[in-house]
Amino acid sequence: MATNESVSIFSSASLAVEYVDSLLPENPLQEPFKNAWNYMLNNYTKFQIATWGSLIVHEALYFSFCLPGFLFQFIPYMKKYKIQKDKPETWENQWKCFKVLLFNHFCIQLPLICGTYYFTEYFNIPYDWERMPRWYFLLARCFGCAVIEDTWHYFMHRLLHHKRIYKYIHKVHHEFQAPFGMEAEYAHPLETLILGTGFFIGIVLLCDHVILLWAWVTIRLLETIDVHSGYDIPLNPLNLIPFYAGSRHHDFHHMNFIGNYASTFTWWDRIFGTDSQYHAYYEKKKKFEKKTE
């Protein structure tokens, strides 16, 4: 009975979304995107698309999303949004981070990306435009990937903080007590593999088109660079997402080294009480600010 009710609710919700979608004006970018997509399919092999296409998407998005935070350090007005104001970025740290990123991206992540083609072939994942999912199904699957990744990240991240293994792996990521956007993927190679597994679990379970790979990469990079940005920007649209952790939540993890282990959402930290020091810190800070007003 419960299963039938769940299916009925899902079907009703799906029909409602489809109805709303039918009322929306036609997307003027759809035709150019369709032409570009078909051009790609006609001029490149699936291996080239899945491997080199995925690498280009990752690198272009990663450094594009890092750019605003990088520029903020040169804009005096933005300093008031810096979370740890006493720890500005340094050229030395950023250059060190950039070099490690290049190694991780091309020596660790690229071999993993090469497996994307074989994954799509084994599971018969389509590439063609005709079978590309509607935007609402794509968003729903990306949300599912985010929930899965966040769950994996919370427990594996917490494990990496265990006193017996922290200094061997996760300590690398904590070299910079005040994070900055480019540091999001600054990590020990083993950590890249361990925490990165959470990214792929959702893909294996939910992928129904190669576009999901790139959509999920886009959302995951946007989120992880945002929480590592070191800035709490007002009117950040990501903060509209229910239970979204945000930059202040993860910045405290880097400052305190303990607690706030989740990557995207706040529920696991809330359930296991690993956000208690975070809330106590900001309550104390609010009281102090009121006294000094």
From Swiss-Prot:
Q: Where is this motif: Histidine box-1?
A: 157-161
Keyword terms: Cholesterol biosynthesis, Cholesterol metabolism, Endoplasmic reticulum, Iron, Lipid biosynthesis, Lipid metabolism, Membrane, NAD, Oxidoreductase, Steroid biosynthesis, Steroid metabolism, Sterol biosynthesis, Sterol metabolism, Transmembrane, Transmembrane helix, Ubl conjugation
Q: Is Cell membrane given among the entry's keywords?
A: no
Cofactor(s) needed: Fe cation
Q: How is it modified after translation?
A: Ubiquitinated by MARCHF6, leading to proteasomal degradation.
* Membrane-topology annotation of the record: Multi-pass membrane protein
- Give the motif span (Histidine box-3): 249-255
This entry's Enzyme Commission designation comes to 1.14.18.9
Reactions that this protein is recorded to catalyse:
4,4-dimethyl-5alpha-cholest-7-en-3beta-ol + 6 Fe(II)-[cytochrome b5] + 3 O2 + 5 H(+) = 4alpha-carboxy-4beta-methyl-5alpha-cholest-7-ene-3beta-ol + 6 Fe(III)-[cytochrome b5] + 4 H2O; 4,4-dimethyl-5alpha-cholesta-8,24-dien-3beta-ol + 6 Fe(II)-[cytochrome b5] + 3 O2 + 5 H(+) = 4beta-methylzymosterol-4alpha-carboxylate + 6 Fe(III)-[cytochrome b5] + 4 H2O; 4alpha-methylzymosterol + 6 Fe(II)-[cytochrome b5] + 3 O2 + 5 H(+) = 4alpha-carboxyzymosterol + 6 Fe(III)-[cytochrome b5] + 4 H2O; 4alpha-methyl-5alpha-cholest-7-en-3beta-ol + 6 Fe(II)-[cytochrome b5] + 3 O2 + 5 H(+) = 4alpha-carboxy-5alpha-cholest-7-en-3beta-ol + 6 Fe(III)-[cytochrome b5] + 4 H2O
GO molecular function terms noted in the UniProt entry:
C-4 methylsterol oxidase activity; iron ion binding
UniProt motif Histidine box-2: location: 170-174
Keyword Membrane among UniProt keywords: yes
Specify the pathway.
Steroid biosynthesis; zymosterol biosynthesis; zymosterol from lanosterol: step 3/6; Steroid biosynthesis; cholesterol biosynthesis
Residue ranges of the TM segments: 55-75, 100-120, 199-219
Which residues are in the Fatty acid hydroxylase domain? 145-274
Q: Name one GO cellular component term.
A: endoplasmic reticulum membrane
Q: What is its main location?
A: endoplasmic reticulum
Q: Which GO terms describe its biological process?
A: cholesterol biosynthetic process
InterPro entries recorded: Fatty_acid_hydroxylase, Sterol_Desaturase_Related
- Subcellular location field: Endoplasmic reticulum membrane
User: Anything noted about its domains?
Assistant: The histidine box domains may contain the active site and/or be involved in metal ion binding.
Assigned protein family:
Belongs to the sterol desaturase family.
Described by its record, this protein's role is as follows: Catalyzes the three-step monooxygenation required for the demethylation of 4,4-dimethyl and 4alpha-methylsterols, which can be subsequently metabolized to cholesterol.
Put simply, this protein is called: Methylsterol monooxygenase 1
Q: Which organism is it from?
A: Macaca fascicularis (Crab-eating macaque)
The record lists the lineage as: Eukaryota, Metazoa, Chordata, Craniata, Vertebrata
